[in-house]
C-alpha cells in the first residue's frame, strides 16, 4: 500500500452535504435491504426490518466513508495504510459506528480487511468500495490513481476501481459546475436515465449500483425523491441509496435534506467528528 503525501484540502460544508446525503440514504435503506422490488414502499425513516436496527441507524457504507474522512481530516493527505487501519478498527472494534459494533459487513470487505489481501477476481466487482468513495471527490487535488488505491484496499478488480473513479467524476462535475451539471450528466448518461425501471438493476455489483444511483438522480428533482426512489428499487437498498444520496446531497445541498430525517439520524456526533 502506498501513501500520497501531497497535501489535500476540502470545503467542510460541501463534505458535510456529501456525507450526510450518503448517511441519510444509507439509514433509509437499512430496514429494507434484500427486499424484492415492489413488495414494500419506503416513505421515510423507520426501524426494525432486515437488520433489526433502530430508525436512523446507518451501516457499513457510512462507516467506511467516515474512515476515509477521518484519515484525511487528521493527516491532510491520502495515506492508504492509515485508511486500511481505520477499516480494521471499524470491523474489529466498532469504531465509526452508531452503537459500537459493525453490522451488515460485506464478505469481500471482511475478508480483505481481516487478511490484508484485496479481491482481484470477479468477486471483487461488488459495490463495497464504491459505497465509500464519495468523500474522495470532495478533495483537492485528487487523481484517479488515488481513488483506485483506496478502492484496492478491499476491491482491486479494475471494474470496481474504475467505477469508483466514475462516481468521483460525476460528483466533481456537480461540485464544479453546479446546477447546470444535471444537464451535462443527462447528455453523458442519458442512455442510463432513459431506461425503464424494469431494466434498472439494484444488486450488489458495482456498475449496477452506480447506474441505479445515477438513474435515480437524473429522474428526480429533489434529494427526498432521489433517495426514496433508490430505496424502492429494492435489493441492495442501503448502498444504492447511499450512493444516490451522496450525489443528491452534493447537488441539492445539506439544506435540501429533510430536517426530520437529520433529526432521526443516529450517530451524528460520530459523523461530525470525522468531517
Regions found by a protein language model. Give the residues of each.
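Structured, active/binding-site neighborhoods that engage oxygen-rich ligands
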Residues: 1-275
